[in-house]
Amino acid sequence: MSDRQAALDMALKQIEKQFGKGSIMKLGEQTETRISTVPSGSLALDAALGVGGYPRGRIIEVYGPESSGKTTVALHAIAEVQQQGGQAAFIDAEHALDPVYAQKLGVNIDELLLSQPDTGEQALEIAEALVRSGAVDIVVIDSVAALVPKAEIEGDMGDSHVGLQARLMSQALRKLSGAINKSKTIAIFINQIREKVGVMFGNPETTPGGRALKFYSSVRLEVRRAEQLKQGNDVMGNKTKIKVVKNKVAPPFRTAEVDIMYGEGISKEGEIIDLGTELDIVQKSGAWYSYQEERLGQGRENAKQFLKENKDILLMIQEQIREHYGLDTGGAAPAQEDEAQAQEELEF
């Protein structure tokens, strides 16, 4: 053994002794090289994300204009985690969560941890405590724009507080990012959009909270309404585009189109018809949709209703779509497979 190798081995032993086993290793020795994910609640979004859902142990930013469906997207993720037996938390800085709507999306509100903090510092400290516990699979913060620093709340209405929120987010994310990775918690930050003053060329839109969240996020999703979905003169929902503007775990810039129906959330039937037609799993002839020898209905809304009533056919089409995109047919196991080890790593 060379002197260099002996010196390296000694340094590695010293690091492990000081910081604990697993604090340094060769990349190929990592026990889990494949990215563990949780389904997003939308098949189209799972495909657009490229890995079959939201990656565990990462920060996700979901932003867009008002009433575009950002909270709906986050609530679907919570419902998926709960269905797999995981623990979810919702930090409602906007004080606007509708429990009835959440329940309709499949969220178990009896088990959902909810916090409605008074200040931005309080919200982020609660998020950090939940992440460091190693027992929470997903934490949603709604929204970054509503994380008001304590100094601003205690000050007068006309006081200037330049850069306070950006500094708060930067400090919080520096502390949170390592703990999120070790505990394999998914942290979803919902954000609004603002317009920069005096921008003549390029996109004037930006997100509040400074640049830190843009850097620390592994995935950034832009949610925008594309068009209204009508039945006669009644508006039933919106066709919504979700663009993956940043992705560190798969190629970015893919787009998912989903129907967000009022009072129902993302329409699984709608996206299965759209994806199925795109992949030629579902055949479209004129206005008629059919699958193999089975006619699904005339017009998209009738085909959606048919799939809603015939779950067996819906599942068969869904299975073929998942197979095409290479998505797991089953969900990922809850994050804490070895809670003791995760807790030990968090406390070193």
Swiss-Prot record:
Q: Which InterPro entries match?
A: AAA+_ATPase, DNA_recomb/repair_RecA, DNA_recomb/repair_RecA_CS, P-loop_NTPase, RecA-like_C, RecA-like_N, RecA_ATP-bd, RecA_C_sf
Instruction: Give the primary localization class.
Output: cytoplasm
UniProt subcellular location:
Cytoplasm
Note down the stretches annotated as region Disordered. 328-348
The UniProt regions of compositional bias labelled Acidic residues, in chain numbering, are 336-348
Domain of life of the native organism: Bacteria
Q: Does the keyword DNA-binding apply?
A: yes
SMART domains, alphabetically?
AAA
Keywords, ordered alphabetically:
ATP-binding, Cytoplasm, DNA damage, DNA recombination, DNA repair, DNA-binding, Nucleotide-binding, SOS response
Which GO biological-process labels does this protein carry?
DNA recombination; DNA repair; SOS response
Q: Which GO molecular function entries does the Swiss-Prot or TrEMBL record give? A: ATP binding; ATP hydrolysis activity; ATP-dependent DNA damage sensor activity; damaged DNA binding; single-stranded DNA binding
Return the protein name.
Answer: Protein RecA
**Whose protein is this, by species?**
Bacillus licheniformis (strain ATCC 14580 / DSM 13 / JCM 2505 / CCUG 7422 / NBRC 12200 / NCIMB 9375 / NCTC 10341 / NRRL NRS-1264 / Gibson 46)
Q: What is the lineage of its organism?
A: Bacteria, Bacillati, Bacillota, Bacilli, Bacillales
